[in-house]
Design a protein with these regions (language model features):
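Glycine-rich phosphate-binding loops that contact phosphosugars or nucleotide phosphates
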Residues: 41-48, 52-160, 166-169
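Short, flexible loop segments at the rims of nucleotide/cofactor-binding pockets, characterized by
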Residues: 19-25, 68-71, 94-97, 205-209
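Short, structured loop/turn "capping" segments at alpha-beta junctions
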Residues: 142, 172-182, 190-195, 215
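An N-terminal, well-structured beta->alpha segment
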Residues: 2-41
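Short acidic active-site motifs
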Residues: 28-32, 77-81, 216-217
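Bateman/CBS regulatory modules and CBS-like beta-alpha motifs in cytosolic regions of diverse proteins
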Residues: 188-219
Length: 219
């Protein structure tokens, strides 16, 4: 196949993976949204490798849309970062296999700390899924990688599950453009949402006549 055919096949596989996931969205998704909405703590996202990279994006999306959240690397967690975890925090653990050792090692602490655990995995019968209070299924029929090794369709499914949670929480909270502007004061979004006429208008305008000399203009 040429590069265009490969690209089209990859997109087809990943779209089919998302449709497969869509058909299985159910009560546990509603439960996850409800628990996150009602918590008085933060939402801590955790994952290794590609799952961790996707987790960072999910945490950033949560934080910028009214859900206090941050990413915690499981390796760093074992070297002091667990001190940031409060009992009222919700812990979202991401692992496609549900057997990532670095993530599983956190379970005893989380249970002892009485944290509510949401697992995002592609295997409902995995150790992580079975030890979570709520499980979000991101299983896909196959990866786009021809060798079924590189995370592709599964990471896309994880990302979209995170987006679905983010938007569902925005809807549940009635998150408005004004709320969005509060968290995005910089960049083009901030300027578009927050700029007022008084910020751009000035009283002292440098007015010169058409017959003024260049020396007068620059002075």
């Amino acid at each position: 196949m040429n590069a265009i055919n490969v690209a089209q096949e990859v997109i087809d596989i990943e779209v089919n993976g998302l449709l497969y996931m869509k058909d299985r969205i159910g009560n546990e998704f509603e439960l996850a949204v409800s628990k996150i909405q009602d918590t008085t703590g933060r939402v801590i996202i955790c994952g290794m490798g590609k799952s961790g990279i996707i987790g960072k994006k999910i945490a950033a999306s949560f934080a910028s849309t009214g859900t206090p959240s941050f990413f915690m690397h499981p390796g760093e967690a074992f070297h002091g970062d667990l001190g940031m975890v409060k009992p009222e925090d919700i812990f979202v653990a991401i692992s496609n296999s549900g057997e990532t050792d670095e993530v599983l090692k956190l379970l005893p602490f989380l249970k002892d700390n009485q944290n509510y655990i949401i697992a995002i995995t592609g295997k409902r019968e995995s150790t992580l899924a079975k030890n979570a209070h709520c499980h979000l299924d991101i299983a896909v029929p196959k990866e786009a990688c021809p060798h079924q090794l590189a995370p592709t369709a599964s990471t896309t499914a994880t990302l979209v599950m995170g987006d679905a949670l983010t938007v569902a929480l925005m809807d549940a909270r009635g998150f408005s453009p004004e709320s969005f502007a509060r968290f995005h004061p910089g960049g083009s979004l901030g300027r578009r949402l927050l700029s007022k006429v008084r910020d751009e208008m000035h009283c002292k305008l440098p007015i010169v006549s058409t017959d003024a000399s260049f020396t007068d203009v620059v002075s």
